[in-house]
């Protein structure tokens, strides 16, 4: 039974919906492994794809039934497997044959054909386009029927798209025998060929982005694959994404439009009359907004299963559809109760495969995007859950403790220069379950004992780690996220008067957690699961929290979801009494931000003692406001004043900034300039802020050693400590404030290259008296590092 491809981009939208410090809300998430993103059934076996494994190549897992249980019997991969190859992003099966798409370097994409015999699978062909270019996205969709394979290349011809036809000859060799070009009138970015299905001599090809996202489907027939029809219901709305899923069986075609009618979704049926394709009607479905009915479809006999991964707050659902009085698949769809409890955000039904007596459904959002799949057995008319299957968790890195390790170009798997490894703890050893990633980090020194602690943000809470013996750090305990909030990629932590203040973005009614850090002294039964000491609810979600320890005020920024958002700007909170925080006012500068609301992504607020004497002793905030630098005087919380805003060339996303210790210069990172190709190396912006009414950009430092995205940076003395995602911690010397030089680094991601992507080192804290620098890296874990003064810059 063939998989009916479910469009991966819609799946990513599903996962983004329930989740939004220091990484921008629109785009600052790492790629998710997505076990279960694509599924197929063939020969009594279930095949489950994981195209983007954590630090591992994409793979297709093969499950067979043994003694009443489904177990892994094989694992398939690319010819030269590599992390990020996206092997299995699309799969399809027919008989004893599997085809899987993959992306390999600058090839433009490939597809592999495997032949199976029992539990043995052999890679028999590597397919590529005869006219391939790197932007083709060849392999994003595949379909196979016997000795014929179709491979979609949605990026071909300026993303108009194309489909390549391959055939197996009598000697068992596969070769390209045709190319189906995008139909006339197809526009750039319509991406013809992103979804495919084939049966016999009928091929179905979708262009889901055509016609303002309404979508269109084309049918082809005969050995020469001549266009037989174009189908697109008149009732389609913009962004309906008609063609996102296709089911085909015995001359009938079902087509999903999961974006239809407020993402309620719809499915349409088509058949042939007198040799012409005609619409038989739409499947009757009322639904609710965001159900995304029609995201996946498969057919077995007279029954079709249809996925609705957005149902029940993205827990997901499957509907069964059978024959009715109006014809095949004419009955009312029935929502199946297949699993008693599904996780919110799991997106059950993004993918599915239906056989006569076995079915499988992907749950790629489970465990924060690690994903899983459910396999069902049929007895009579009843389907029962047989097994939940999943891939291994974690990055495969072991803890490194006991003795500090001096950097000599390499420490274990990690490349480095002038930065030594004191210790490393993987995510799992500090409270992270399957799929959990780390994000923000801050530090606290106990004034009574002198012990230093790392306060480590996770997707699902905050970990506390005693680093007073830095070579032997101890996980002390966990403060879980607010009970009703979903996990969040974006968590942020700051400290005031021995209390931690914690916010999260895209996290529903999370609010601000307040935790008394002196409770970490009592740890007889470590690790301890803690509860909050106070909970501030005048905000719901916030992207970051800023604290001015000299004034006793906190500022949540990037607020959303309800309550007092302050336009996404500064929500000011009096925290002089940490356990009784009180709202103090709002500030936003509507001349900044993508929506011109004054949205502040991050900020630093200080009691000003810099060179501009006009503002001496005032409380000044330096905001990174998506599109510009914003400087404000917030001394009077009821009457804050915008002093200035400053833009700069090639802005991608103004992300975060930190002052030099004399408050003369401000060092800023932009999160999207590297990713969007606006600069060709990692860029640090240097501002002269000696005149607060007129900040001047004096330097754009392009680091010749990296091309990664710069994320969070902090200044201590004459050094800037940058967490730069895939290139890890970078140390810049600013003895000459306007001529930074890189003098050290520790790459926290020992997998893949350093190309710009949201993956790796999130943040760091360099302010401990011990000189230990604590660094988080998403899937890897917590690093304790120490910088060694360099004799010369890295070149």
Model-based region annotation:
Residues 12-13, 482:
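Short, linear, compositionally biased motifs with a strong N-terminal bias
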Residues 21-795:
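Feature marking well-ordered beta-strand scaffolds used for ligand recognition
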């Amino acid at each position: 039974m063939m998989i009916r491809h479910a469009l991966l981009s819609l799946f990513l939208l599903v996962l983004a919906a329930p989740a939004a410090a220091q990484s921008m809300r629109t785009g600052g998430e790492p790629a998710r492994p997505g076990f279960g993103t694509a599924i197929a059934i063939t020969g009594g076996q279930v095949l489950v794809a994981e195209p983007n494994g954590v630090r591992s190549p994409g793979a297709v897992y093969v499950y067979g039934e043994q003694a009443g249980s489904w177990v892994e019997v094989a694992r398939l991969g690319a010819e030269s497997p590599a992390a990020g190859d996206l092997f299995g992003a699309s799969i399809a099966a027919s008989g004893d044959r599997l085809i899987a798409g993959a992306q390999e370097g600058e090839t433009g994409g490939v597809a592999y054909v495997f032949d199976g015999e029992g539990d043995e699978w052999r890679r028999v062909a590597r397919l590529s386009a005869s006219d391939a270019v790197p932007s083709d996205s060849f392999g994003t969709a595949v379909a196979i029927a016997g000795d014929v394979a179709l491979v979609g290349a949605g990026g071909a011809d300026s993303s108009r798209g194309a489909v390549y036809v391959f055939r197996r000859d009598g000697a068992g060799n596969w070769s390209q025998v045709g190319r189906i070009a995008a139909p006339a009138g197809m526009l750039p970015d319509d991406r013809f060929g992103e979804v495919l299905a084939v049966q016999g001599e009928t091929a179905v090809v979708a262009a889901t982005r055509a016609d303002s996202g309404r979508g269109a489907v084309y049918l082809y027939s005969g050995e020469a694959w001549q266009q037989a029809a174009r189908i697109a219901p008149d009732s389609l709305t913009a962004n309906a994404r008609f063609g996102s899923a296709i089911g085909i069986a015995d001359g009938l075609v079902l087509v999903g439009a999961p974006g239809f009618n407020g993402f309620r979704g719809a499915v349409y049926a088509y058949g042939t009359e007198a040799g012409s394709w005609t619409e038989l009607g739409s499947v009757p479905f009322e639904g609710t907004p965001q159900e995304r009915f029609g995201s996946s479809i498969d057919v077995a006999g007279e029954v079709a299963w249809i996925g609705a991964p957005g149902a029940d707050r993205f827990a997901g659902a499957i509907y069964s559809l059978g024959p009715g009085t109006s014809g095949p698949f004419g009955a009312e769809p029935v929502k199946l109760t297949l699993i008693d409890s599904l996780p919110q955000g799991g997106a059950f039904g993004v993918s599915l495969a239906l056989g006569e007596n076995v079915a499988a459904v992907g749950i790629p959002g489970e465990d924060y995007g690690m994903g899983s799949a459910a396999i069902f057995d049929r007895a009579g008319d009843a389907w029962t859950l047989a097994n939940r299957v999943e891939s291994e968790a974690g990055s495969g890195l072991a803890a490194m403790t006991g003795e500090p390790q001096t950097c000599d170009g390499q420490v274990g798997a990690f490349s480095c220069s002038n930065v030594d490894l004191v210790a490393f703890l993987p995510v799992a050893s500090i409270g992270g379950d399957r799929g959990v990633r780390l994000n923000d980090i801050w530090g606290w020194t106990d004034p009574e004992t002198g012990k230093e602690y790392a306060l480590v943000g996770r997707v699902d809470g905050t970990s506390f780690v005693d680093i007073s013996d830095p070579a032997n750090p101890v996980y002390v305990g966990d403060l879980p996220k607010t009970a009703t909030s979903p996990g969040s990629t974006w968590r942020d932590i700051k400290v005031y008067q021995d209390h931690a203040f914690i916010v999260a973005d895209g996290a529903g009614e999370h609010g601000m957690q307040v935790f008394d850090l002196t409770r970490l002294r009592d740890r007889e039964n470590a690790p301890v699961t803690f509860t909050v000491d106070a909970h501030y609810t005048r905000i719901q979600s916030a992207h970051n929290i800023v604290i001015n320890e000299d004034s006793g005020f906190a500022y949540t920024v990037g607020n959303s979801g309800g309550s007092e958002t302050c336009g996404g700007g500064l929500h000011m909170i009096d925290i002089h009494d940490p356990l009784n925080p009180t709202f103090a006012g709002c500030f936003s500068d509507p001349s900044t931000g993508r929506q011109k609301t004054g949205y502040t992504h991050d900020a630093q607020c200080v009691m000003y003692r810099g060179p501009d004497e006009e503002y001496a002793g005032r409380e000044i905030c330096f905001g990174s406001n998506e599109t510009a630098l914003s400087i404000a005087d917030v001394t009077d919380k009821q009457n804050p004043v915008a002093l200035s805003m400053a833009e700069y060339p090639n802005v991608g996303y103004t992300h975060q900034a930190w002052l030099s210790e004399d408050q003369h210069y401000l060092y800023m990172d932009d999160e999207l300039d590297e990713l969007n190709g606006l600069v060709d190396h990692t860029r640090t912006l240097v501002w002269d802020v000696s005149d607060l009414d007129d900040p001047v950009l004096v330097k754009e430092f392009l680091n010749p050693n990296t091309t990664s995205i710069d994320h969070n940076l902090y200044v201590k003395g004459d050094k800037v400590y940058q967490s730069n995602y895939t290139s890890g911690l970078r140390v810049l010397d600013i003895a000459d404030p306007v001529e930074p030089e890189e003098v050290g680094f520790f790459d926290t991601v020992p997998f893949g290259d350093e190309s710009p992507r949201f993956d790796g080192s999130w943040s760091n804290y360099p302010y401990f008296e011990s000189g230990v620098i604590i660094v988080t890296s998403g899937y890897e874990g917590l690093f304790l590092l120490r910088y060694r003064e360099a004799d010369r810059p890295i070149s």
